[in-house]
Amino acid sequence: GRQRRHYDLHSAMRPSRLAQFAICPWREGGGAQPDALARLHGLAIDGVLLQRQTSSTFSAMTATLHGAEAFTLELAEGKGEDLQPEVLQFEQGLIAMIEGRELSAGAEAQPQLLCISREIIKRSSRFRLCIPADIENFAPLPIGSLLAEDDGMRWVVDEPEACILFPMADVAEGQRAALIVVPLEQSDR
């Protein structure tokens, strides 16, 4: 039968240590297959965040309801009017896939796999992130560093190899202000 693939494309809102990355929605029966990860690597995707619970993203819906190989993709931040080399490699790889050609990445090649260790949720108007406003996605977080405070609650890094993802102080109360992510192997230790 025909293989359904859905790549929900986004442009990065901030600089990132991983130029391009994907978010793999959780679905019953497991996460991304090795061949899907190899395809992403061939599309210049550096990392894949594997979700461990359901979400309300477009890619989660197409994966669940339509059985699609679905990912949300965060593409490299543009500088001026020029496309980044990673975006051009992504575009060329996507054209090759549409034309039925094989991508150049080997079957064993995979992007870095990550998972969410913790979410930082804004609980009150006193919430503040204690990291630089211009911090890059996937910037490493030293153990013991203070990430956020909110009405007596403190988020302190206790995960080895932790990185920050999607830090946003100006979200509504009850919303996610940041994610702490770790390499997949680290989360299983």
Kindly give the residue locations of the regions a language model identified.
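Structured catalytic-domain cores with a bias toward divalent-metal coordination
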Residues: G1-R189
